[in-house]
Curated annotation (Swiss-Prot):
It is found in: Cytoplasm; Nucleus. It comes from Arabidopsis thaliana. It catalyses: AMP + ATP = 2 ADP; ATP + H2O = ADP + phosphate + H(+). GO terms for molecular function: adenylate kinase activity; ATP binding; ATP hydrolysis activity. Pfam families: AAA_18. Residues 118-128 are annotated as: LID. Gene3D superfamilies: P-loop containing nucleotide triphosphate hydrolases. This is Adenylate kinase isoenzyme 6 homolog. GO terms for biological process: developmental vegetative growth; ribosomal small subunit biogenesis; rRNA processing; unidimensional cell growth. Belongs to the adenylate kinase family. AK6 subfamily. Broad-specificity nucleoside monophosphate (NMP) kinase that catalyzes the reversible transfer of the terminal phosphate group between nucleoside triphosphates and monophosphates. Also has ATPase activity. Involved in the late cytoplasmic maturation steps of the 40S ribosomal particles, specifically 18S rRNA maturation. While NMP activity is not required for ribosome maturation, ATPase activity is. Associates transiently with small ribosomal subunit protein uS11. ATP hydrolysis breaks the interaction with uS11.
Length: 178
């Protein structure tokens, strides 16, 4: 439950954003972290599909154009309350006030290539995602969108990396003070 202190709502539990290029392990990391910490896991892609928060389809990239305002309206109360782990491949449209930690997962391109081709990515979609990772687009987006001190970059190449990341983030959540 969120507390009010001099008109300012303070969360009892932190909110984290787990972001990165598709295939970097966001969903695996975020769901394992939610299980380890009893925080709520919110996959934006699933929410968009479930609530139909989209307007059209991008044939070239094979994805929906999401209605960002609908996503924000849907999640605002939960984010004010706190205790959420949000999983999404972008971060620039979320309000800065929502997050106490923004985690950008990074993966070597050879590993990412294998993961994405195993998912059936090809052509422009595969190429765009590999370039996005190579040029650190999501890391730059996070640094441009949030205070430097809350942005963390973690490597996510192996199962061991993911396990270590979950452990590190669990420790951070357990030590977090509102």
């Amino acid at each position: 439950m969120a507390r009010r202190n001099r008109g300012v709502t303070r969360r009892e539990r932190p909110n984290l954003l787990i972001t990165g290029t598709p295939g970097t392990g966001k969903s695996t990391t975020a769901s394992a972290l939610a299980e380890a910490t009893n925080l709520r896991y919110i996959c934006i892609g699933d929410l968009v599909k479930e609530k139909e928060f989209y307007h059209g389809w991008d044939n070239e990239l094979e994805c929906h154009f999401i209605n960002e305002d609908s996503v924000i309206d849907e999640l605002d109360d939960a984010m004010i309350e706190g205790g959420n782990i949000v999983d999404y491949h972008g971060c620039d449209f979320f309000p800065q006030r929502w997050f106490d930690r923004v985690v950008v997962l990074r993966t070597e391109n050879s590993v990412l290539y294998d993961r994405l081709t195993n998912r059936g990515y090809s052509g422009t979609k595969l190429s765009n995602n590999l370039q996005c990772e190579m040029y650190q687009v999501l890391l730059e987006e996070a640094h441009d969108s949030y205070d430097e001190e809350i942005v963390t970059e973690l490597q996510s190449n192996t199962i061991e990396d993911i396990s270590n990341n979950v452990s590190t983030l669990t420790d951070w959540i357990n030590a977090w003070q509102p």
